[in-house]
């Protein structure tokens, strides 16, 4: 039996034809995790995405997209909508993702996929699918607890909170500590991030004081841990008046709650 989790961004960023400036296209992830929750091996599994539907924000027109690359785990799988997962052992999972970009800003409205597997299992592939769930993707992150691998994981929204879906088939709640966190300027143009020490996974999203004009290059925790590059980032969102809001994000686990955020001007 297979559980399929899809991870779709809501917004994709490219040029907005209704603004005078030309905005750059930003690559985004369309992700899938295939978890074999049964007792038998799922042999020679392939997933082929249908053409995702991405519409332009203003007029609802379909937008073309470019596939920059496909991946199964960390292995490059070409630039097509087909991903070959091979065999998936019982009680294990594999991660797939497509890296894409569009020329225009827009949003995802629809995504479908089809599946092929070896006949040795018998029956149509749909008979093997226990559950299909689609999630709003926040970011590719990396769970770095002991025993984890070096494959990126999916941080997704769930109601008012978050969950992280890891490459070994687990999914766990993520505490949203944005409401208890603070950012303060320190020497060298850097920022001090503080929130309560927490066991478990945490995600913090706070307004970026530099409004996207500086680059976040390093995050250091008070106990000496240097966060992986996957686990801190900057984001932006378009407001109804066409202005932008800018944010700083940190994802971590079992944390002291005290960090130094190191910025660069370029």
Feature names for model-found ranges:
Residues 36-41, 51, 104-106, 119, ...:
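Short, acidic/polar linear motifs in exposed loop/turn regions
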Residues 85-108:
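Low-complexity, intrinsically disordered segments enriched in Ser/Thr together with acidic residues
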Residues 235-266:
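Surface-exposed interaction regions enriched in Ser/Thr/Asp/Glu
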Residues 17-43, 159-195, 200:
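Short beta-strand elements of extracellular/lumenal beta-sandwich folds
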